[in-house]
Amino acid sequence: MPFSPSDAWLQGLGAAFVQLAAGEFAAAVRGTHTSPVRALGKWLVDTLPTPLIDVAIALLRRGDKPAIAIALTLFSLGVPAMAATAGTATLVAALLLSGLLGLYALWRRTELSRTTAATLGLVATAAGILGVFFGAEASFAIGFAAAGLALVIRRVRQRRRAEPVRLPRPQAPLGSPPGSASLEIPGLSELITPVDRFFVTDVTFPAPSVVLRQWRLVVRGMVEHPLSLTLDELLSLPSREIDAVLMCVHNPVGGPFVGNARWQGVLLRDLLVRAGAATEADHVRLHSVDGFSAGISLSLLKDGFEPMLVYAMNGTPLTRAHGAPVRALVPGIHGYDANIKWLASVEVMRFSEAIDYAERKGWPRRPSRMAPNSRIDVPNHSALLAPDRQIVAGVAWSPPHGVAKVELRIDGGPWQVCALATALGPSAWVQWQAPWDATPGRHTLETRTWGREGVQAELAAAPYPDGARGYHRIAVDVQSTRTPQRRQVCWWLASDARARGLLAWRGITAWRRHRPHRG
């Protein structure tokens, strides 16, 4: 009996759902988070033109990865569902094509063995094709059962893998921040960003889950004594603490992709001495467990930059999202350039031989240094204030040499020097404040930071190629006839949409203008 179009559509949707769920189930059984559809997400990120990715980040901010996941899921379900209306043979062909794409994406993942990649891809493909003959109701039942089992298996494995890590005492503990380092102003960014509110961004899809007992840190390349350290062996080495800002290169001026934390780990230079790095080596390539790589020019050491391999954040072991068990940290360098997560190996080499992920995507080969930067946290953009004395406050940073002063300007007038809280260190951000006698009307507030080696750039620029530039600027209303508001929603939404669109346009223009190197 022939199917009606709606019945055929449901049959195709059910078979596609079985295929997706079977891929997740097989991945859970094999002990990996990389299922076929997630591998496709990573392949998509690696394949799309970098300017297009930059536009997506500018427009979607934290929603870029969820948008990719939703789009891939809808595509994986929708194409077979539509193909089913053309007949069973067309449906089988669509599922086979989807399965082969997933297999190809899995095959590219360096953290998966060939056996695992083939198993996941073939299981998902076979399950989808078999789902054609189950019927819609049975397919959905099997799919939900497989997805539920995958969730249970992953949670059980996660609990078993949750091994306690006892952090060593650093050589010179920093101690608690002094009270003078924190300004008690509502709405001001915290001096130390809590781990659960620290921004998370990377090109991994999904974040790797590392088994601590099996993890090794390998130091190789141009060294006399190659090293292979367990986590316990790394923890036994002399460590230090540092308060430092970490910022994504895609962070717009005044944006959320920046945080300040207390990190603990070992100095890269100590590991290089231990391994006997060759004197002619001038570059270090860092490899992640998922195949991502980034480099550190050893010339940075002469300029006051101090790369570290860190395993603790705010006094606790790194979380999976933040790179557990070990990540690199180079205060003063943007995140993508050297601060890689889930570190697996350190390769000592010559710069002339180094082409890493970012360079292959068109980013410059030179180190991406953070510029002096300042952000206004209080008041919010679009706030409605009363006509009396207001406090303007925010945070400023200029790692690794520190902030010299912060200035505030109202309506394009003269700059006034802001009061700084006590700095935790040259690589950390510092809180600042300034009084303002607000008068009725709409006003524009701007801030800039003077670092030890220069001042924040005024000319607005896109994140590519050296990080976003320009003064952080907000506008507020001052009225005596209305109740003060933290944010005027409609105005704020319109301004936010305009800012995202402008950032995306600047990004496209920057890529056209610079004609980036491609490795």
How should these model regions be labeled?
Residues 61-84, 96-99:
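Hydrophobic alpha-helical transmembrane segments
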Residues 7-32:
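N-terminal signal-anchor transmembrane alpha helix
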Residues 165-515:
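Structured, non-membrane catalytic/scaffold regions adjacent to prosthetic-group chemistry
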Residues 3, 7-15, 67-71, 93, ...:
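Alpha-helical transmembrane segments of integral membrane proteins
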Residues 91-182:
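Hydrophobic helices that insert into or interface with lipid environments
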Residues 37-59:
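Extracytosolic (periplasmic/ER-lumenal) interhelical loops and adjacent juxtamembrane/interface segments
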Residues 4, 8, 35, 60-68, ...:
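Membrane-helix interfacial "entry" motifs
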Residues 15, 19, 23, 45, ...:
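Alpha-helical transmembrane segments in multi-pass membrane proteins
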